[in-house]
């Protein structure tokens, strides 16, 4: 399904949180807080033609109670206003933009995560 955000909005896929503590305790999905970072999947025409400050593939940080959650083709996304983006963590070259698994992302230098923990 294709989705095009309107106004100054972006479609973001949240990054997955670690489901295990450093001591090996598995955290159930309902006890985990949702991550406050994600990969920009689609940028509205107003942003792509205007400020160009955020682009597809950027890893961004956003506020805890910001945006609207939607589900497209069984995948959860966030629709965020440009002003709700706190900053860019990594620009366009994170392993998540290429659908790589964390386990295989160690060779990607520009990835947004510290893979020593994984």
UniProtKB/Swiss-Prot annotation:
Q: Name one GO molecular function term.
A: protein-folding chaperone binding
Protein name listed in UniProt: Co-chaperonin GroES
What organism is the protein native to? Helicobacter pylori (strain Shi470)
Q: Which GO terms describe its cellular component?
A: cytoplasm
Phylogenetic classification of the source organism: Bacteria, Pseudomonadati, Campylobacterota, Epsilonproteobacteria, Campylobacterales
The family database entries (PANTHER family) matched by this protein are listed as: 10 KDA HEAT SHOCK PROTEIN, CO-CHAPERONIN GROES
Assembly: Heptamer of 7 subunits arranged in a ring. Interacts with the chaperonin GroEL.
Give the protein's function: Together with the chaperonin GroEL, plays an essential role in assisting protein folding. The GroEL-GroES system forms a nano-cage that allows encapsulation of the non-native substrate proteins and provides a physical environment optimized to promote and accelerate protein folding. GroES binds to the apical surface of the GroEL ring, thereby capping the opening of the GroEL channel.
Sequence similarity:
Belongs to the GroES chaperonin family.
Question: What compartments host this protein?
Answer: Cytoplasm
Q: Which InterPro entries does the entry link to?
A: Chaperonin_GroES (IPR020818), Chaperonin_GroES_sf (IPR037124), Chaprnonin_Cpn10_CS (IPR018369), GroES-like_sf (IPR011032)
Alphabetically list the UniProt keywords: Chaperone, Cytoplasm
An example Gene Ontology biological process: chaperone cofactor-dependent protein refolding
